[in-house]
Amino acid sequence: MTEVKSKETRAPSSARDGAVLLQAPPSRGEAEGIDVALDGLLYPRSSDEEEEEEENEEEEEEEEPQQREEEEEEEEEDRDCPSYRPGGGSLSKDCLDSVLDTFLAPAAHAAPWSLFGPEVPEVPVAPMSRGPEQKAVDAGPGAPGPSQPRPGAPLWPGADSLNVAVKARPGPEDASENRAPGLPGAEERGFPERDAGPGEGGLAPAAAASPAAVEPGAGQDYLHVPILPLNSAFLASRTRQLLDVEAAYDGSAFGPRSSPSVPAADLAEYGYPPPDGKEGPFAYGEFQSALKIKEEGVGLPAAPPPFLGAKAAPADFAQPPRAGQEPSLECVLYKAEPPLLPGAYGPPAAPDSLPSTSAAPPGLYSPLGLNGHHQALGFPAAVLKEGLPQLCPPYLGYVRPDTETSQSSQYSFESLPQKICLICGDEASGCHYGVLTCGSCKVFFKRAMEGQHNYLCAGRNDCIVDKIRRKNCPACRLRKCCQAGMVLGGRKFKKLNKMKVVRTLDVALQQPAVLQDETQSLTQRLSFSPNQEIPFVPPMISVLRGIEPEVVYAGYDNTKPETPSSLLTSLNHLCERQLLCVVKWSKLLPGFRNLHIDDQITLIQYSWMSLMVFAMGWRSYKHVSGQMLYFAPDLILNEQRMKESSFYSLCLSMWQLPQEFVRLQVSQEEFLCMKALLLLNTIPLEGLRSQSQFDEMRTSYIRELVKAIGLRQKGVVANSQRFYQLTKLMDSMHDLVKQLHLFCLNTFLQSRALSVEFPEMMSEVIAAQLPKILAGMVKPLLFHKK
């Protein structure tokens, strides 16, 4: 009765509903340390441990039973010791406290070292050796709760205080089910049960404990390591397991509870990150309320821990309150050898060690050296980055994922992204001609552009180009090279190529694999220059620049006296060579091969004159500033030679074109888009067979012209005016080309009388199409109405 009264006089703590403060006996001479390992959380190492690791595992297993027997004998001697004062509580209460003392007392200390900043402050704390008088004083209205210790209380030698928040039991039936038959209940152990109150059935907040005072010895430091906040159900259940198991091992008549152990993978679900994303109470070394554990020893467990009556899940418990103070968990650790997880990775854990909250074995993680100390971090990557964003951010990238599938992914955390050829998907060897490609596609593009190859697709211009089938259709392969933005002169921009390689690696880090249909979007990203030394060029314009034909020579002999017939004959041969270049250029033009083959032939026959005159005007503008007509490098007509020719009026009409280029200062990008639109500038009256594809293609090149205008002009008004001027220039080409067609047809009809030669191809085109064009059987596409 005396013992019951002394317990009733103690007021229950108001720090947490359903929480019971576990106190130690009044006095202890010495306490033995038992291995407590946080498997998968922290594995600090010291110099003593490195020496002990060299011992054989068999010797450690033989020493374990002897140490356990010695611990039990010393605990029995402590109960019979004269220094033991039974007035501090009942016998069962003292047994319970002795169990806690045994788990919490270290036997020695390892070499000191610190990891995460400042040492743990030395704050006096209420010892576990307080008597009932002190407990009664604490129960007063003005006395601090268990979370606020008395600074003047004497310290219990060789141990720290432990405040554990235990889940309140919902009722007698649940309490009887959760403990083994014959085991004493909460009242029999020496402390009363508390009502759950409004929070019955919920979780008691974890570890609202007082800051534990640490009294280091001479030259002794403490490892102050913040770890994940744990669910209160985990702490409460683990506390009950520790109490019951130790009571069974202390020689009681009741055997240990036979409960299936919970896999370590399930325990990781009990940790939860801070609710509001703010910095936790353990950031920057601040000292907050925490659970502190000191342990020392090296040993391999031999039996699985009996933990929880049944396999628990987070859904079985209510979520802890998030509005109040965030629960925290700190640990002061010394030598602790991580026991292997049960299963395929090694022997099961012992009942003396805390279960791990990591789902991966420590062997999967590479050791980290922080501040000169060798340590292995075993936190799961997902939980660590969500729960502890403020914990050493520079080192979070070294934490491996806790699953095998993530480690076997295409791009592991220690490997560089693979460079993929944008043409065939093979491994790229570098940035060739402005695009990241392999060596095979590099050589193919160079030979195709420098040679006189005329590739034709045997299918529908949609052949698959990959590593295996890239040699099947060179036409589709070359078209894909041009669409990707390969330019034969791109190798001159070495600085741009280096920038493209860097950006390609950045794109590969964000997207592990580049799909074939994403080539254009990726090319657009690669074409951007951050330093603005090389202006941004849209990918389509880059393709147009790459397929632009080279300059063709007329083969005119300037040493001979010039006659009207010889000049016209030279111009006809030059037109035939340029017509071949137009055919080759049109095949490489993006979208043109998607049209019907008859439509392709018709468009070339209707527009060849426009394309050749427009290109001649551009050469005159670029090479001679519009002062002469630059037909070819070996055939340039100045004003005097124009007057001496038989077509001086036509020369004056053609001369206006380069002068307009000079007045408008047309850029190369604008010229390339306008030239592509001139190919699509005239159609038959009845329309084309693939009219819808034609309209879509023409619309796309009009958009490209707008983009080209936007490269130089700033503002909507300026862009609109520029677009109006350029489209008016293209509309004026119809009148100029009509005059040239009429002169060409008349010369062709009178070729024998004028002694003018016409090549075979030119003769066929003129005889078949010029009469239809001059008869008005075609439809010119105008941007503006006359």
Swiss-Prot record:
Residues 1-95, 110-212, 252-279 are annotated as: Disordered. It is found in: Nucleus; Cytoplasm. Composed of three domains: a modulating N-terminal domain, a DNA-binding domain and a C-terminal ligand-binding domain. Residues 421-486 bind DNA. There is a cross-link at K7, K294, K385 (Glycyl lysine isopeptide (Lys-Gly) (interchain with G-Cter in SUMO)). Disulfide bonds: none annotated. The steroid hormones and their receptors are involved in the regulation of eukaryotic gene expression and affect cellular proliferation and differentiation in target tissues. InterPro entries: NHR-like_dom_sf, Nucl_hrmn_rcpt_lig-bd, Nuclear_hormone_rcpt_NR3, Nuclear_hrmn_rcpt, Progest_rcpt, Znf_hrmn_rcpt, Znf_NHR/GATA. PROSITE patterns: NR_LBD (PS51843), NUCLEAR_REC_DBD_1 (PS00031), NUCLEAR_REC_DBD_2 (PS51030). This is Progesterone receptor. The lineage of its organism: Eukaryota, Metazoa, Chordata, Craniata, Vertebrata. SUPFAM superfamilies: Glucocorticoid receptor-like (DNA-binding domain), Nuclear receptor ligand-binding domain. Oviduct and bursa of Fabricius. Residues 143-154 have a biased composition (Pro residues). Residues 48-79 have a biased composition (Acidic residues). Keywords: Cytoplasm, DNA-binding, Isopeptide bond, Lipid-binding, Metal-binding, Nucleus, Phosphoprotein, Receptor, Steroid-binding, Transcription, Transcription regulation, Ubl conjugation, Zinc, Zinc-finger. Residues 1-420 are annotated as: Modulating, Pro-Rich. There is a cross-link at K294 (Glycyl lysine isopeptide (Lys-Gly) (interchain with G-Cter in ubiquitin)). A zinc finger (NR C4-type) spans 421-441, 457-481. Residues 532-766 form the NR LBD domain. It comes from Gallus gallus. The keyword tRNA processing does not apply. Residues 1-10, 186-197 have a biased composition (Basic and acidic residues). Belongs to the nuclear hormone receptor family. NR3 subfamily. It holds the Pfam family zf-C4.
